[in-house]
UniProtKB/Swiss-Prot annotation:
Record-linked PANTHER family: HYDROPHOBIC PROTEIN RCI2 LOW TEMPERATURE AND SALT RESPONSIVE PROTEIN LTI6 -RELATED, PLASMA MEMBRANE PROTEOLIPID 3
Keyword Electron transport in record: no
Keywords: Cell membrane, Membrane, Transmembrane, Transmembrane helix
Organism encoding this protein: Aspergillus fumigatus (strain ATCC MYA-4609 / CBS 101355 / FGSC A1100 / Af293)
TM region positions: 34-54
GO CC terms of this entry: plasma membrane
Protein's recorded name: Plasma membrane proteolipid 3
Function: Plays a role in the regulation of membrane potential. Could mediate a proton leak.
Cysteines joined through disulfide linkages: none
Compartment(s): Cell membrane
Length: 57
C-alpha cells in the first residue's frame, strides 16, 4: 500500500501527539478514547497504538 501525503502527516502527528493522529484517521470514537488513555499511561504505548490505527485503516 503506497503512502499518501496525508498518511505521512498523520504519522508525524502520531509521533508528536498520538491522539491527534488517531483522530485524523478514525474521528471521535472508541479508538480515540483508547489512545488518549494509553498516552496518559505512557507516551510510547500511545504512539504504538496510533501507528497501528494509521497502518490498519
Amino acid at each position: 500500500m503506497p503512502f499518501t501525503a496525508s498518511d505521512i502527516c498523520k504519522i508525524l502527528f502520531a509521533i508528536i501527539l498520538p491522539p491527534l493522529g488517531v483522530f485524523l484517521e478514525r474521528g471521535c470514537g472508541a479508538d480515540l478514547l483508547i489512545n488518549i488513555c494509553l498516552t496518559i499511561l505512557g507516551w510510547i504505548p500511545g504512539i504504538i497504538h496510533a501507528f497501528y490505527i494509521i497502518f490498519k485503516y
